[in-house]
């Protein structure tokens, strides 16, 4: 008995939606919430996914993938922060002190449990 009531409810809702769509006259305009999420749904595009997706949606997809890849790493390299530039081109030099003859690691810290140095 409960199943038949559920079926009747679904049929009634579908009938209301269909009558609302037909009364507006234009199928595409009445379902803006569907078209906003998938611009190529009704276009009949037969190309690749990249060709069928609008440019702005494609760029959002690309940045989403980039964020996921960066989220998997524990660090961001200097190359990712500044494209086409090298922080220090001298071999073995520190990124922070890129002068000739400078120490590669000028920092010194005391021995403690946190630094795990051997005593």
UniProtKB/Swiss-Prot annotation:
Q: Please outline how this chain is modified post-translation.
A: Proteolytically cleaved, probably by S1P, a subtilisin-like serine protease (subtilase).
BP GO annotations = calcium-mediated signaling; cell-cell signaling; regulation of growth
The signal peptide annotation in the UniProt record is 1-23
Pro-peptide positions? 24-70
Q: What is its main location?
A: secreted
Disulfide bond as UniProt keyword: yes
Q: Specify whether Electron transport is a keyword of the entry.
A: no
Subcellular locations according to the entry: Secreted
A Pfam family it matches: RALF
Q: Output the InterPro entries linked to this UniProt entry.
A: RALF (IPR008801)
Q: Which GO terms describe its cellular component?
A: apoplast; plasmodesma
Q: What does this protein do?
A: Cell signaling peptide that may regulate plant stress, growth, and development. Mediates a rapid alkalinization of extracellular space by mediating a transient increase in the cytoplasmic Ca(2+) concentration leading to a calcium-dependent signaling events through a cell surface receptor and a concomitant activation of some intracellular mitogen-activated protein kinases.
Please give the family membership noted in the entry.
Belongs to the plant rapid alkalinization factor (RALF) family.
- The protein, known as: Protein RALF-like 22
Q: Which organism is it from?
A: Arabidopsis thaliana
Q: What is the lineage of its organism?
A: Eukaryota, Viridiplantae, Streptophyta, Embryophyta, Tracheophyta
């Amino acid at each position: 008995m409960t199943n038949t009531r559920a079926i009747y409810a679904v049929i009634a809702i579908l009938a209301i939606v269909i009558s609302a769509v037909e009364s507006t006259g234009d199928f595409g305009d009445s379902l803006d919430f569907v078209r906003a999420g998938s611009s190529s749904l009704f276009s009949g595009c037969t190309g690749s996914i990249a060709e069928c997706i609008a440019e702005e949606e494609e760029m959002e997809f690309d940045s989403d993938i980039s964020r996921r890849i960066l989220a998997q790493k524990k660090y961001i390299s200097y190359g990712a922060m500044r494209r086409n530039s090298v922080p220090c081109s001298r071999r073995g030099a520190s990124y922070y002190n890129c002068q000739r003859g400078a120490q590669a690691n000028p920092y010194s810290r005391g021995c403690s449990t946190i630094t795990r140095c051997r005593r």
